[in-house]
């Protein structure tokens, strides 16, 4: 069973909500999945206000008809202490390209110059060698078929460095709620699927970091989105160090059916390696989609929203505590922590803060 808690700001209140109806697959999972999304709206007291559910299905490359229901639970948590409210989500487009000029890499990507068999590491993309996909995060076509090598007709999705997000996805997305993203392979060469930008990676808002105060390294695994939604995009925070968290600029980033989306991270126990943790996990493994805690991060209308979210796949507390702390001179509305297996605020539903100026840290201690 898979948690899908992709966050998107909704309506005119400071509420984090996720419209995630995504096919998920990787090279270990070539099957047909019926993805069931259950979105829960939660008020400041932790009470569920509105439940909803939708489904989407797609066929895998090998044509197997093994149907798996993947329950998706989304926390929508009101920032009770927020002094401002978020504006209504845009519904004018199903996809929005990033307009930021901040990028990482060695320059602009040139269409048709790199073979599909070569991973474009020099362009800012980060190779994920442990997945066995030639460095790619996922390889999918518009029909939901997957492959283990980048080939004609497929979108080859990739990871970026911590604090950055990929820029490539086609404006035309599957009508059934799945998403695809990455460079497009055509006639053996790689092409941009989003020609509005020449870079492969774009910097996020820069308003959050992960700070590790425990003795072991922590593998934080972002979801491959738009794309497979597998939790394979790594941010590894060594003991006593920090790394930027990609806070998606929602107003200019990918939109799912006209709704803003933000970043989602699965956090493994301290000491779990990136190769063992940033994968599609198995039931009871405690890694990947079975990791003990999930983080959310997004920026819209001048406000950063940061969340600590329970993973319904894993009720066990992690081997660390975590809290969201304002940096010096910053303003954070609300309090959010997960200490000794207990969330602050309403208790078991997770918590959200709004950063109205400056930045904040996810502190692991």
Curated annotation (Swiss-Prot):
Locations listed in the record: Mitochondrion outer membrane; Secreted, Cell wall
A molecular-function term among this protein's GO annotations: hydrolase activity, acting on glycosyl bonds
An example Gene Ontology biological process: fungal-type cell wall biogenesis
Record's signal peptide: 1-17
Further details from the record: Present with 56900 molecules/cell in log phase SD medium.
Induction of its expression: Induced by hydrogen peroxide. Repressed by superoxide radicals and anoxia.
InterPro entries the record matches: Beta-Glucosidase_SUN, SUN
Annotated family: Belongs to the SUN family.
Disruption phenotype: Leads to increased resistance to zymolyase treatment and to boric acid.
Protein purpose: Involved in aging, oxidative stress response, and in the regulation of mitochondrial biogenesis. Inactivation of UTH1 increases life span, leads to higher resistance to heat stress and against hydrogen peroxide, and increases sensitivity to the superoxide radical-generating drug paraquat and to copper. Also required for the selective autophagic degradation of mitochondria (mitophagy) in response to nitrogen starvation. Involved in the remodeling of the cell wall during the various phases of yeast culture development and under various environmental conditions and plays a role in septation.
Entry-linked Pfam families: SUN
Top-rank taxon, per record: Eukaryota
Membrane topology category: Peripheral membrane protein
Name under which the protein is recorded: Probable secreted beta-glucosidase UTH1
Entry keyword annotation includes Cell division: yes
Enzyme Commission (EC) number: 3.2.1.-
Listed GO CC annotations: cell surface; extracellular region; fungal-type cell wall; mitochondrial inner membrane; mitochondrial outer membrane
Keyword Transport tagged: no
């Amino acid at each position: 069973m898979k948690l899908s808690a992709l966050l998107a700001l909704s309506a005119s209140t400071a509420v984090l909500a996720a419209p995630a109806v995504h096919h998920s697959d990787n090279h270990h999972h070539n099957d047909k999945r019926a993805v069931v999304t259950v979105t829960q709206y939660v008020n400041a007291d932790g009470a569920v206000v509105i439940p909803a559910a939708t489904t989407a299905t797609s066929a895998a490359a090998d044509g197997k008809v093994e149907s798996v229901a993947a329950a998706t639970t989304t926390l929508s948590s009101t920032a009770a202490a927020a002094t401002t409210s978020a504006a209504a989500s845009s519904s004018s487009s199903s996809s929005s390209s990033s307009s930021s000029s901040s990028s990482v890499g060695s320059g602009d990507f040139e269409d048709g110059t790199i073979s599909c068999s070569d991973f474009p590491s020099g362009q800012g993309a980060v190779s994920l060698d442990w997945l066995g996909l030639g460095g790619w995060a996922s390889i999918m076509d518009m029909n939901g078929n997957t492959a283990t090598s980048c080939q004609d007709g497929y979108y080859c999705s990739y990871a970026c460095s911590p604090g950055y997000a990929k820029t490539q996805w086609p404006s035309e997305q599957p009508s059934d709620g799945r998403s695809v993203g990455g460079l497009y392979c055509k006639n053996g060469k790689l092409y941009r699927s989003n020609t509005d930008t020449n870079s492969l990676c774009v910097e996020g808002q820069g308003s959050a970091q992960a700070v590790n105060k425990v003795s072991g390294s922590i593998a934080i695994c972002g979801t491959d989105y738009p794309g497979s939604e597998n939790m394979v995009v790594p941010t590894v925070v060594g003991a006593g160090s920090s790394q930027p968290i990609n806070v998606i600029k929602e107003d200019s980033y990918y939109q799912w059916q006209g709704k803003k989306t933000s970043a989602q991270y699965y956090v493994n126990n301290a000491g779990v390696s990136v190769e063992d943790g940033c994968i599609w996990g198995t039931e009871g493994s405690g890694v990947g989609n079975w990791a003990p805690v999930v983080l959310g991060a997004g920026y819209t209308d001048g406000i950063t929203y940061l969340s600590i979210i329970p993973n319904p796949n894993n009720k066990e507390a992690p081997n660390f505590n975590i809290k969201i702390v304002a940096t010096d001179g910053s303003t954070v509305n609300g309090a959010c922590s997960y200490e000794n297996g207990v969330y602050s605020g309403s208790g078991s539903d997770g918590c959200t803060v709004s950063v109205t100026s400056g930045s904040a840290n996810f502190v692991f201690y």
